[in-house]
Amino acid sequence: MLKDIFGKKKYATITLYKDNAGPAVPSNTHSSKSNGNPVSEMKENKRMGARSRIAALIDKDTFIEYDSELESCNPLSFPKYAEKILAAMETSMEKDAVITGEGTIRGESCVLCVMNPDFMMGSMGSVVGEKITRAIEKAIEKKLPVIIFCASGGARMQEGILSLMQMAKTSAALGRLGEAGLLYISVLTDPTTGGVTASFAMLGDIIIAEPGALIGFAGPRVIEQTIRQKLPEGFQRSEFLLEKGFIDQIVSRKDMRNTLASLLRIHRLGGEMHA
């Protein structure tokens, strides 16, 4: 499968699925900002809402959402945080910044976590960490692979150390997933930064990125202000990270469903051969 470990294209193109049949919208979709028209959001330069992304990936009527009732509180009584949560709920029509569940992609079962950039820029607080951890634990229980679509500005500052703790919690859960011999695919979208990059985003067995996605810890402006130097053109973009070996493959949105289905199938068939 490895084509050129020192080149920009580390994986050969997988063409197990060649048809152009489109996915259907999951039966539990919301009418909201984060669930726009999946077709209109397939353009690479437009950030994609979580519901639209699920609609573009998951087979019709197969998505079962986990923990949809969980919502953020204000554990540290951070000023105006409660108001920001309510505003984010109203604009996104979601309770927090990640949707988790299970379904099939071209018949291949998986647990899917999709971060929602429409909710406080996908920042990771206690609810995000808890939902992702529970989803991973469910995958271990059901012996299913995990796919996480990352889109985040980082840890949610209004929750302080409780937010930072989610980095360790999600990473530990992924460690248990690996010990169980299960696949984890991380998909990095624009932007993937901060504490999410420093935890589960970069722990995938296979790390995929969308074209042109901003991926890093601190943002480019912060780095430039700190080191007082101009960064190279394209620094922290997915193409730069592929060239430097930090990610495995860049996949466009139109090819994402087929690529993920093929990887899931290869892993499943490989597991069956060694069972």
Curated annotation (Swiss-Prot):
GO terms for molecular function: acetyl-CoA carboxylase activity; ATP binding; carboxyl- or carbamoyltransferase activity. Keywords: ATP-binding, Cytoplasm, Fatty acid biosynthesis, Fatty acid metabolism, Lipid biosynthesis, Lipid metabolism, Nucleotide-binding, Transferase. InterPro entries: AcCoA_carboxyl_beta, Acetyl_CoA_COase_Trfase_b_su, ClpP/crotonase-like_dom_sf, COA_CT_N. GO terms for cellular component: acetyl-CoA carboxylase complex. Its EC number is 2.1.3.15. Disulfide bonds: none annotated. It catalyses: N(6)-carboxybiotinyl-L-lysyl-[protein] + acetyl-CoA = N(6)-biotinyl-L-lysyl-[protein] + malonyl-CoA. It is found in: Cytoplasm. Residues 26-38 have a biased composition (Polar residues). Residues 18-275 form the CoA carboxyltransferase N-terminal domain. Component of the acetyl coenzyme A carboxylase (ACC) complex. Biotin carboxylase (BC) catalyzes the carboxylation of biotin on its carrier protein (BCCP) and then the CO(2) group is transferred by the transcarboxylase to acetyl-CoA to form malonyl-CoA. Acetyl-CoA carboxylase is a heterohexamer composed of biotin carboxyl carrier protein (AccB), biotin carboxylase (AccC) and two subunits each of ACCase subunit alpha (AccA) and ACCase subunit beta (AccD). NCBIfam families: accD (TIGR00515). Belongs to the AccD/PCCB family. This is Acetyl-coenzyme A carboxylase carboxyl transferase subunit beta. The gene is accD.
